[in-house]
Amino acid sequence: MSYTTRQIGAKNTLDYRVFIEKAGKVVSPFHDIPLYADEENQIFNMVVEIPRWTNAKLEITKEEAMNPIIQDTKKGKLRYVRNCFPHHGYIHNYGAFPQTWEDPNVAHPETKAYGDNDPLDVLEIGETIAYTGQVKQVKVLGVMALLDEGETDWKIIVIDVHDPLAPKLNDIEDVEKHLPGLLRATNEWFRIYKIPDGKPENQFAFSGEAKNRKYALDVIRECHEAWCQLVAGKAADDKKVSLANSTLQESVAYAPEVAAAVPAANPLPDAPIDKSIDKWFFISGSA
C-alpha cells in the first residue's frame, strides 16, 4: 500500500499544505489511511508530520477538508519548537496514528484528564530521519502519558519495522536495553520544550513512567473506537472536526468529490526561517 504526497505552497508559510495521495487520489490521513498495516501481526501505519531535528510545528489539521498537514499557528504567526539544550528541534520523528481520536468528551480513568481532540501522537525512534507526509509501518513498544495544559496527550513509542533494531525491540524494557538514555531524554524534552515560550513545565501521569506495549495497545484500541464513533456521527461532540473522506462509504461524511477538488501539486522552494529559531535555550534543572 503505497502513499505519496501532494505539496501546495512553500514550507514555512501560512499557505503550506501537504496532502496524502493513494494512486494519485487524495485521501485523508486522519480518516482514510487504515490504522493497521497488518492487524494480525500488530503492525500499524504512522503518518509522519515532523521529521526529527526540525523545528516547524506541523500537524494534521482537523478543521480543513481532507485534513492536510499544515504548520500550526498562534495569533496568526507560524509556530516553531525552540531548541532546548542539548536537543535540537523535535527529538524524534513525530506523527500520528490514522483512524484514532483522543476524545475530549471523555476523561481517562487513570490520568483523570480529558482527551486533547487530536489523533494519537506517535514517536518513531528509529535511525532514519523521516519526511513530512511519509506513511511508515511501525511496531508499538510503549507509551508515555503527557498532561499537556490539563489534557491527556498520549505519546505512543514505536519503531519503523524496517529499522535494523526493530527485531530486537519488542517492548518498552528493550528500548532502555538497546537505546540507553532515550526514554529519559524523551521525558525531559516533553517536560521542558514549552518553557522558552513562557509556559510552565509539562507534567506526566504515572510519574513520567513509560508504560509497556500492552498498555499502549489498549490506548490505541480505545482511541480507535472513539474515532469509529466520531466518523459514524455518534460522538457526544465532534468539536468541528472535518470528517470528509474518500473511502469510508458508510461514514457520515463520505465525499470523494471533495477529495477530487483539491488543487494540483504546486510545491515552492522553502521560505526562510527567522534566525531566532536557531537559538539554544539553557533550562535550569533539565539535565
Curated annotation (Swiss-Prot):
Alphabetical UniProt keywords: Cytoplasm, Hydrolase, Magnesium, Metal-binding
UniProt-listed CDD domains: pyrophosphatase (cd00412)
Alphabetized Pfam families for the sequence: Pyrophosphatase
Catalyzed chemical reaction(s): diphosphate + H2O = 2 phosphate + H(+)
EC number: 3.6.1.1
GO CC terms, sorted: cytoplasm
Residue sites binding diphosphate per the record: R79
GO biological process, one term: phosphate-containing compound metabolic process
TM ranges: none
Cofactor (UniProt): Mg(2+)
Residue positions binding Mg(2+) 2: D121
MF GO annotations: inorganic diphosphate phosphatase activity; magnesium ion binding
Binding-site residues for Mg(2+) 1, renumbered to this chain: D116, D121, D153
Subcellular location: Cytoplasm
Similarity comment: Belongs to the PPase family.
Name assigned to this protein: Inorganic pyrophosphatase
